Structure formats: structure tokens, C-alpha cells
């Protein structure tokens, strides 16, 4: 809950800058930052689109450990760029996220890269035995997918 509140506060602060077009707001995040972007969409804030690169998918929970309901509908467009062999976000986690997004009527898409683990955009990631390794194809393809995603929604 605290993380989601901080994301909302940061987003509200950002929208107050004169340079920001409030009708063209988006968020991207990598790993934990991907979770942050998803949690911002889950909050119901008026953000046009979010992109998660090899993110974490668990929904915000209360201090009691009980999952929060959050908004009943997600209006943000969502792009999830996922390494299928990511040990931090398993295929089961990916399906649970897809089910959550469907239940909230979100406009979403998941691009899963086969034989790709966590941190696939980080050229210095080289712990293949732990599932953390760079993949040039997934890195370049995911970046282009993000650019295409934002060009369509903006």
C-alpha cells in the first residue's frame, strides 16, 4: 500500500509541472520499477499507459497481508514485456496477472520472450544459473515494442 501511495504522490506531483501534457502521461519500469508502473495503473490514476520490463506482478497488499481490491476497472493501457523463464515472475505469475487485468477490464498485452530470463535488458546481467541474463533480441525487440505502444496511445 505504501508503495502505491508513493507512486500516486509522485504522479500527482509530476502532473503539476507546466511542461507536462496531462493527457499524455505514461510510466515505464524495469524489475521493481515495473511493479511500480503496474501498481500505478492498478490505483485508478488517470495515466494513459504503463510498460513493465521484466517486472514483478504481485498486487499491492495491506499490512495485514490481505490483497487490496484497488480499482474495479483499469483504464490505462498496459504493455508487459516478459522473459518467460524469469524466476522472479514465473509463467504462473504471468497468468495470474493476465487474469487480474482481464477481471478489471484493462486494455493489456503481454509479450513473452522464450528462453529469456530476468534482467534481459541489462547488458551486464550474467547470472544465467540464477535466471538473470541479458538477451540482445529481447532487449531490442522490447524497446521497439514500447516505442510503438506509446506512439499508438499518444
Describe the residue ranges of each PLM region.
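N-terminal cap/leader regions of alpha/beta-hydrolase-fold enzymes
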Residues: 1-154
Amino acid at each position: 500500500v505504501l508503495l502505491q501511495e508513493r507512486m500516486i504522490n509522485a504522479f500527482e506531483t509530476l502532473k503539476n509541472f507546466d511542461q507536462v501534457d496531462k493527457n499524455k502521461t505514461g510510466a515505464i519500469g524495469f524489475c521493481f520499477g515495473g511493479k511500480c508502473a503496474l501498481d500505478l495503473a492498478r490505483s485508478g490514476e488517470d495515466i494513459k499507459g504503463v510498460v513493465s520490463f521484466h517486472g514483478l506482478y504481485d498486487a499491492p497488499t495491506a499490512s495485514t497481508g490481505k490483497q487490496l481490491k484497488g480499482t474495479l476497472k483499469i483504464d490505462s493501457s498496459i504493455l508487459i514485456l516478459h522473459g518467460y523463464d524469469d524466476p522472479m515472475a514465473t509463467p504462473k505469475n504471468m497468468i495470474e496477472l493476465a487474469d487480474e487485468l482481464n477481471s478489471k477490464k484493462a486494455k493489456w498485452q503481454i509479450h513473452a520472450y522464450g528462453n529469456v530470463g530476468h534482467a534481459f535488458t541489462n547488458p551486464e546481467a550474467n547470472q544465467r544459473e540464477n535466471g538473470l541474463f541479458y538477451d540482445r533480441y529481447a532487449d531490442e525487440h522490447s524497446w521497439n515494442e514500447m516505442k510503438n505502444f506509446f506512439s499508438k496511445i499518444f
